[in-house]
Amino acid sequence: MSNASHNFDWQQLPDMPVAKWEPASLLINNKLYVLGGYENYIMSSRRLDVFDPESGHWTKLQDLPSALSHVNLVPDRNGFWFAGGMKDKIHPGKDHIISEVWHYDIDLDRYTAAPLLPGHRAGGGLARIGNNLHYVSGLMAD
Protein backbone atom coordinates (compact mmCIF):
# COMPACT_ATOMS: atom_id res chain seq x y z
CA MET A 1 0.00 0.00 0.00
CA SER A 2 1.36 3.40 -0.96
CA ASN A 3 1.77 6.16 1.59
CA ALA A 4 2.04 8.79 -1.14
CA SER A 5 0.09 11.94 -0.52
CA HIS A 6 -1.17 14.26 -3.18
CA ASN A 7 -1.20 17.96 -2.48
CA PHE A 8 -3.28 20.04 -4.82
CA ASP A 9 -5.86 22.77 -4.68
CA TRP A 10 -9.34 22.51 -6.16
CA GLN A 11 -10.30 25.35 -8.47
CA GLN A 12 -13.80 26.25 -9.72
CA LEU A 13 -13.90 26.30 -13.53
CA PRO A 14 -16.71 27.39 -15.86
CA ASP A 15 -19.87 25.27 -15.64
CA MET A 16 -20.82 22.95 -18.48
CA PRO A 17 -23.23 24.56 -20.98
CA VAL A 18 -25.99 22.14 -19.91
CA ALA A 19 -26.42 20.64 -16.44
CA LYS A 20 -26.16 16.85 -16.56
CA TRP A 21 -25.13 13.87 -14.50
CA GLU A 22 -23.56 10.50 -15.29
CA PRO A 23 -21.89 11.65 -18.52
CA ALA A 24 -18.83 9.89 -19.92
CA SER A 25 -15.63 11.92 -20.04
CA LEU A 26 -12.13 11.60 -21.43
CA LEU A 27 -9.03 13.80 -21.65
CA ILE A 28 -7.37 13.96 -25.09
CA ASN A 29 -4.66 16.47 -26.00
CA ASN A 30 -5.34 18.42 -22.80
CA LYS A 31 -9.03 18.87 -23.66
CA LEU A 32 -11.90 17.33 -21.71
CA TYR A 33 -14.60 15.63 -23.81
CA VAL A 34 -17.98 15.13 -22.06
CA LEU A 35 -20.52 12.89 -23.78
CA GLY A 36 -24.13 11.92 -23.11
CA GLY A 37 -25.43 11.39 -19.59
CA TYR A 38 -28.75 12.58 -18.20
CA GLU A 39 -30.32 16.02 -18.50
CA ASN A 40 -33.70 17.41 -17.41
CA TYR A 41 -35.83 14.96 -15.47
CA ILE A 42 -33.69 11.94 -16.29
CA MET A 43 -33.68 12.24 -20.06
CA SER A 44 -30.64 10.93 -21.89
CA SER A 45 -28.51 13.54 -23.63
CA ARG A 46 -27.24 13.68 -27.24
CA ARG A 47 -24.67 16.35 -26.37
CA LEU A 48 -20.94 16.15 -26.87
CA ASP A 49 -19.01 19.11 -25.47
CA VAL A 50 -15.30 19.77 -25.12
CA PHE A 51 -13.65 21.95 -22.49
CA ASP A 52 -10.33 23.66 -23.18
CA PRO A 53 -8.70 24.51 -19.83
CA GLU A 54 -6.24 26.89 -21.50
CA SER A 55 -8.98 29.15 -22.87
CA GLY A 56 -11.53 28.30 -20.17
CA HIS A 57 -14.22 27.76 -22.83
CA TRP A 58 -16.68 24.98 -23.63
CA THR A 59 -17.46 24.14 -27.27
CA LYS A 60 -20.46 22.13 -28.44
CA LEU A 61 -19.57 19.46 -30.98
CA GLN A 62 -21.81 17.36 -33.22
CA ASP A 63 -24.66 15.66 -31.35
CA LEU A 64 -24.47 11.93 -30.74
CA PRO A 65 -26.36 9.70 -33.19
CA SER A 66 -28.89 9.20 -30.36
CA ALA A 67 -29.33 10.12 -26.70
CA LEU A 68 -27.09 7.93 -24.56
CA SER A 69 -25.85 7.27 -21.03
CA HIS A 70 -23.88 4.58 -19.17
CA VAL A 71 -20.97 4.41 -21.63
CA ASN A 72 -17.20 4.61 -21.26
CA LEU A 73 -14.80 6.24 -23.68
CA VAL A 74 -11.41 4.97 -24.84
CA PRO A 75 -9.00 7.04 -26.94
CA ASP A 76 -7.25 6.24 -30.17
CA ARG A 77 -4.96 8.31 -32.37
CA ASN A 78 -7.67 10.52 -33.90
CA GLY A 79 -10.63 10.32 -31.54
CA PHE A 80 -12.36 7.90 -29.22
CA TRP A 81 -14.60 4.82 -29.07
CA PHE A 82 -17.75 4.15 -27.05
CA ALA A 83 -19.92 1.04 -26.86
CA GLY A 84 -23.21 -0.18 -25.41
CA GLY A 85 -25.08 2.07 -23.02
CA MET A 86 -28.61 3.10 -22.19
CA LYS A 87 -30.46 4.88 -24.94
CA ASP A 88 -33.26 7.44 -25.07
CA LYS A 89 -34.59 7.09 -21.52
CA ILE A 90 -37.74 9.09 -21.00
CA HIS A 91 -38.87 9.39 -17.38
CA PRO A 92 -40.54 7.29 -16.04
CA GLY A 93 -39.89 4.88 -18.91
CA LYS A 94 -37.52 1.96 -18.81
CA ASP A 95 -33.93 2.16 -20.03
CA HIS A 96 -33.26 0.65 -23.44
CA ILE A 97 -29.89 -1.15 -23.27
CA ILE A 98 -28.07 -1.32 -26.60
CA SER A 99 -25.16 -3.05 -28.35
CA GLU A 100 -24.06 -0.19 -30.62
CA VAL A 101 -20.36 0.64 -31.04
CA TRP A 102 -19.25 4.05 -32.32
CA HIS A 103 -16.05 5.90 -33.14
CA TYR A 104 -15.86 9.70 -32.95
CA ASP A 105 -13.23 11.42 -35.13
CA ILE A 106 -12.15 14.67 -33.46
CA ASP A 107 -10.74 16.34 -36.59
CA LEU A 108 -13.78 15.52 -38.75
CA ASP A 109 -16.37 16.01 -35.93
CA ARG A 110 -18.01 12.82 -37.20
CA TYR A 111 -19.31 9.50 -35.83
CA THR A 112 -18.80 6.17 -37.57
CA ALA A 113 -20.70 2.99 -36.63
CA ALA A 114 -18.69 -0.18 -35.96
CA PRO A 115 -19.79 -3.83 -35.59
CA LEU A 116 -22.21 -4.36 -32.70
CA LEU A 117 -21.28 -5.88 -29.35
CA PRO A 118 -22.22 -9.58 -29.10
CA GLY A 119 -25.04 -8.62 -26.72
CA HIS A 120 -26.81 -5.59 -25.26
CA ARG A 121 -24.75 -4.06 -22.41
CA ALA A 122 -24.56 -0.82 -20.42
CA GLY A 123 -22.28 0.54 -17.74
CA GLY A 124 -19.50 -1.97 -18.34
CA GLY A 125 -15.81 -1.33 -18.79
CA LEU A 126 -14.34 -0.60 -22.22
CA ALA A 127 -10.63 -0.91 -23.04
CA ARG A 128 -8.56 -0.80 -26.20
CA ILE A 129 -5.62 -3.18 -26.41
CA GLY A 130 -3.74 -2.78 -29.67
CA ASN A 131 -6.38 -2.59 -32.39
CA ASN A 132 -9.00 -4.48 -30.38
CA LEU A 133 -11.80 -3.21 -28.15
CA HIS A 134 -12.67 -5.22 -25.04
CA TYR A 135 -16.00 -4.78 -23.25
CA VAL A 136 -16.16 -6.16 -19.70
CA SER A 137 -19.20 -6.82 -17.51
CA GLY A 138 -22.07 -4.30 -17.41
CA LEU A 139 -25.84 -4.45 -17.18
CA MET A 140 -27.66 -6.70 -19.62
CA ALA A 141 -31.04 -6.11 -21.23
CA ASP A 142 -33.99 -7.80 -19.50
Model-found features: residue ranges?
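Kelch-like beta-propeller repeat domains
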Residues: 1-142
